[in-house]
Structure formats: structure tokens, C-alpha cells
Amino acid sequence: MFEAPDSPYLVPFDGTFSVAGASTTPLTDGKPHKGKFRRKRTEELNKLQRVLAAGDKHSILLVFQAMDAAGKDSTIRSVMQGVDPSGCQVFSFKKPSSLELDHDFLWRTTCRLPERGRIGIFNRSQYEEVLVVRVHPKILDYQKLPGDIDLASIWDERLSSIRQQEEHLARNGTVILKFWLNVSKDEQKRRFLSRLDEVDKNWKFEPNDVKERRHWDDYMGAYEQALNATSRPWAPWYAIPADDKPYMRARVA
């Protein structure tokens, strides 16, 4: 199976990752990792995507998770801009539809897994079920789950299901790379304010995003447990500093 490329931002596989110890700013001055560095990596990605398509034995799944305003959309656009669109597909997962709620929590992402020879990108993912839903457990009331819900065990059970599915995919040729774009609370606030102050960014502002800031510590706890439970050599997590967007995009590339 595929094994994780080494990186200073690789979440360890032994469950010792700490959100508090994860940097939101570059570990270097960032200069070597901007501009030319990202463009060179993007060119390499384009070439490698053609090799992937020609081989038709493997697929690549890129998963992006982050707090609001971390830069998921812009990072995906920036990193993948040189890749042949016919070999790449992006799916953004919002609130589940009624059809999706008629299935298990992994169904909607399973249906969108990339075929052999293609790159699939999840902008948010099945991990919402152990992040947003964990912070707001009342959502479980609308998920049509059988029997009584045990909040003491359901999150570990869901993380186990995700972990097992990822191992199954890896054994069958899917290369999985997961990125947590780690933005600080102060930088998130600055970006929210810029969405109000700058007319061309007004459309990005959502009042609910501000409400979610009240649950920041709960989210950090949920992220810490999720990353520790599911970072494995065949499906690694990378905690990428997100306060400096150009650096973040370069590191993802």
C-alpha cells in the first residue's frame, strides 16, 4: 500500500498529535515555498496526472477539512489549476440532502470516490460527521439512526468506520492524502472582518460562521481526536499552517 510522504506537518500515527502544539504559521520564513515553488509543483502534478490516467490502476483522493475562512476553496483552485480537468473532480459537501439521510453516513462520499486513473477532491467530507455533528449532537436526531444513540461511543464507532474504509480503499489502489488547514482564531476573525469591509468579499460572509466561533474549543477537541484516530501511513493527515495563504498552498502542492 501507499505510505505517507514525510513532512514536518505530518500528523503522527501513534495518537500523540496535539492541536495546541500545531503551528498556524510557517515553520520557516516561507519565502522558498511561495510563487515559483508552488508553480513548479503544479506543473509536476499535471505531468503525474497523465501518468496516473495512463496506468489506470490507482486513483488519488485528496480530503480538505478546516474551520471557516481557512482557505479550502482557494487552495484547491490554486494547487489544481494546471491539472487536466478531465482527470480531476471536486466535490463540496454541505448539509446532507433527504436522499443522503436515507443512507448511512459514509454513503454520500462513497458514491463520489474517484475512479482508477483520476484525482478526486473532497472539500469537506465524511469527517463532518465526527466534527460538526459532534459539536452539535442534536443533528443526530435527524439522521434516522436505529435504536438509542449512545453519545459515549458513537464518535469512536464512526471514526473506526472511516478508518476501516480508508484502509480498504488503500488496499485497492486509492492513494489518500488528507489536509487540515489550520487557521488561528485571530486570523479567522481578521478574514471574517475583511468579508464585511471589502465589497467584493461580501458574498462570502455568512452570519452562522460567526456563531460557530463560539464553539471553537469544541471543534479543536473534535479535530484532535479525529486526526489522531485516522492518521495512518496509508491515509495520512497533514496539519498545514493556514495563517499565511501562499505558504499554505505551496505546502499542499
PLM features per residue range, with description:
Residues 1-253:
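Glycine-rich phosphate-binding loop of ATP-dependent small-molecule kinases
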